[in-house]
């Protein structure tokens, strides 16, 4: 069912809340109690524990450097796909991650499937892993799986063996049916076995990573107990630290509580100077990015995630969003996003999942303004940027290369689209919610017309009349067609055939004009005189019973070169009706005269009602 077909009538199963209001609920809050089964769910402090950290320090921290990144698209992301990656798609993803600058890449769970095993062997045997890139392989804390993992990695230069077991209250009780002692022993036994087996593969630089899976559902004191025991077995040093990964396997709490738990571990873990503290946030509550940022401020050193937030359920934390959030704060993410469209295209191909239009930084619509006030602010912001490097210039008169080193300050655009390989063509799009700013921007950037501010309201009303009548969006071509129909193509009641202008030769002499016209279907020739070509033409039209008073005039070059064109805009009161006219021609003079004719026809065309300037 398409979105357009989805709403037929109000769904019968939705029950409008009519229950009692909360005790103490203020009178201005009209919400009512719902029939949702709230009694089935426990708050985090009851389900797990109430983490108390009154002297927390993370709220005062700032993110000033990027973390160590680890991309888990090829494992955690891949396992969540409807159609898991083929070997060819895995290669494409791996090559993309390397090209972007990731130095730690989780490449699979080689003991879990032959496909993953074969892929790990392929990238090792074909020399696809750069010397400064470390591959990471995932394995459960079981002996036969651990041995198979080492077999898969034989011959690799740098490998992180990532072993894990779940430590949460729920999984201990429901899945494994083990007590705390048994769960801890499972972890330490795996650590001892891994350390022993690694001795059989001396040519590889082995590093270790342990995750108390479902960390967010684990009491922090117990998580520390298990982690400390594993660290004691692996015996890391400050020169050769191990990674302790604290996964929000299921996001269960608000980001501030997650940050408290990270800071608690950061403060209390034994041998902290020999530990790289890592985060692995998921997005079940929709706050994975916030949790990662606050957790990083709370003492973490490293973050695992996926491009565009792929992963089980609602996905892993989005590394694109995290990294580009840092860029907007002047922090180098140490990853390259200069062609985000290519990155997105590759990810969509590999995952066979579309990146939503509203996904931060990468979606089709994230740099697009439809709202009139937003469009006006963006338009003015871009012009202000241009004026910084060339006083008085508009955004169409200054190249992006000239702006490249200028501080970015444009309302509603937290990042310059061109810094990530996007362009300005789709920054402003017009629908029924748009205003003069958006219309003016498109006419300026796409069609070279700098519509005067006082005319922008009039033309935006013309465009809005179309969107109100027809619905949907008005693209650039459609907008030009509307403009041409409204201002350039009218030939009734006056059509210009030929104009001969003689400019004044002295200060006290008038300009003169001879105008060959078709007026109400008849060929006519009229003469006029005035203190300039426009006044002379108005005088000529007066002889046809057309009273024209020029009230505002603007002009500019539309194009340059041998075929240069000029554009002129005239606000005129024609027989008591105030309208704008527009002319485009090879010279300013003839463009201006065309603009007067345009205004006359818009005011007097009985077959086509014009939008009047200023509502007159």
Swiss-Prot record:
Coiled coil: none annotated. Residues 490-616 are annotated as: Regulatory domain. It catalyses: 3-methyl-2-oxobutanoate + acetyl-CoA + H2O = (2S)-2-isopropylmalate + CoA + H(+). It holds the Pfam family IPMS_D2. Residues 1-34 are annotated as: Disordered. It is found in: Cytoplasm. Its EC number is 2.3.3.13. The gene is leuA. This is 2-isopropylmalate synthase. PROSITE patterns: AIPM_HOMOCIT_SYNTH_1, AIPM_HOMOCIT_SYNTH_2, PYR_CT. It is an enzyme of class 2 (transferase). Its cofactor is Mg(2+). Disruption phenotype: Lacks 2-isopropylmalate synthase activity, no longer grows in the absence of leucine, increased lysine formation when the appropriate leucine concentration is supplied. Its main location: cytoplasm. C.glutamicum strains classically bred for lysine production are leucine auxotrophs.
């Amino acid at each position: 069912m398409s979105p357009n077909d989805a709403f037929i009538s109000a769904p019968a199963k939705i029950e409008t809340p009519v229950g009692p209001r909360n005790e103490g609920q203020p009178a201005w809050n009209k919400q009512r109690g719902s029939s949702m089964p709230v009694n089935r769910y426990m708050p985090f402090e009851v389900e797990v524990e109430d983490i108390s950290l009154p002297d927390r320090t993370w709220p005062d921290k700032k993110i000033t450097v990027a973390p160590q990144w680890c991309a888990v698209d090829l494992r955690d992301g891949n396992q969540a796909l409807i159609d898991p990656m083929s070997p060819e798609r895995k290669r494409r993803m791996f090559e993309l991650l390397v090209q972007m600058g990731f130095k730690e890449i989780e490449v699979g769970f080689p003991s879990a499937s032959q496909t993953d095993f074969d892929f790990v062997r392929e990238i090792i045997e074909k020399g696809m892993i750069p010397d400064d890139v470390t591959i990471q392989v995932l394995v459960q804390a079981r002996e036969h799986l651990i041995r198979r993992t080492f077999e898969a990695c034989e011959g690799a230069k740098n490998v992180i063996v990532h072993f894990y077991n779940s430590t949460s209250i729920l999984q201990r009780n429901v899945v494994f049916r083990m007590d705390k002692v048994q769960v801890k022993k499972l972890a330490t036994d795996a650590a001892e076995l891994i350390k022993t087996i690694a001795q059989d593969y001396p040519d590889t630089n082995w590093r270790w990573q342990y995750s108390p899976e479902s960390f967010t559902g684990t009491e922090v004191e117990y998580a520390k107990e298990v982690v400390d025991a594993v660290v004691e077995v692996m015996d890391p040093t400050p020169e050769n630290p191990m990674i302790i990964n604290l996964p929000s396997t299921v996001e269960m709490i608000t980001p501030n509580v997650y940050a408290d738990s990270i800071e608690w571990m950061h403060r209390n873990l034994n041998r902290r100077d020999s530990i790289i503290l890592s985060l692995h946030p998921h997005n079940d509550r929709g706050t994975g990015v916030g949790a990662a940022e606050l957790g990083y401020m709370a003492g973490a050193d490293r973050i695992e995630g996926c491009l565009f937030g792929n992963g089980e359920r609602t996905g892993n934390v989005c590394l694109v969003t995290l990294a580009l959030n840092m860029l907007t704060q002047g922090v180098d993410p140490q990853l390259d996003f200069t062609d985000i469209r290519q990155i997105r295209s590759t990810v969509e191909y590999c995952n066979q999942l579309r990146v939503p239009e509203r996904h931060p930084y990468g979606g089709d619509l994230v740099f697009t303004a439809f709202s009139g006030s937003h469009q006006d602010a963006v338009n003015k912001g871009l012009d202000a940027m241009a004026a910084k490097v060339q006083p008085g210039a508009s955004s169409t008169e200054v190249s992006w290369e000239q702006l490249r080193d200028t501080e970015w300050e444009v309302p509603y655009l937290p990042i310059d689209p061109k810094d990530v390989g996007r362009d300005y063509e789709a920054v402003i799009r017009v629908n029924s919610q748009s205003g003069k700013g958006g219309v003016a921007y498109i006419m300026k950037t796409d069609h070279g017309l700098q519509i005067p501010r006082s005319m922008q309201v009039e033309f935006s009303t013309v465009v809005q009349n179309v969107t109100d009548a027809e619905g949907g969006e008005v693209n650039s071509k459609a907008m030009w067609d509307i403009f041409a129909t409204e201002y350039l193509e009218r030939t009734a009641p006056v059509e210009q055939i030929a104009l001969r202008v003689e400019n004044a030769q002295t200060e006290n002499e008038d300009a003169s004009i001879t105008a060959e016209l078709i007026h109400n279907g008849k060929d006519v020739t009229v003469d006029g005189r005035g203190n300039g070509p426009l006044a002379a033409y108005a005088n000529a039209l007066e002889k046809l019973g057309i009273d024209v008073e020029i009230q505002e005039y603007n002009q500019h070059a539309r194009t340059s070169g041998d075929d240069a064109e000029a554009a002129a805009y005239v606000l005129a009161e024609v027989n008591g009706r105030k309208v704008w006219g527009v002319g485009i021609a090879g010279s300013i003079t003839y463009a201006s005269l065309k603009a007067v004719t345009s205004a006359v026809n818009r005011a007097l065309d009985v077959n086509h009602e014009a939008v009047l300037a200023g509502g007159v």
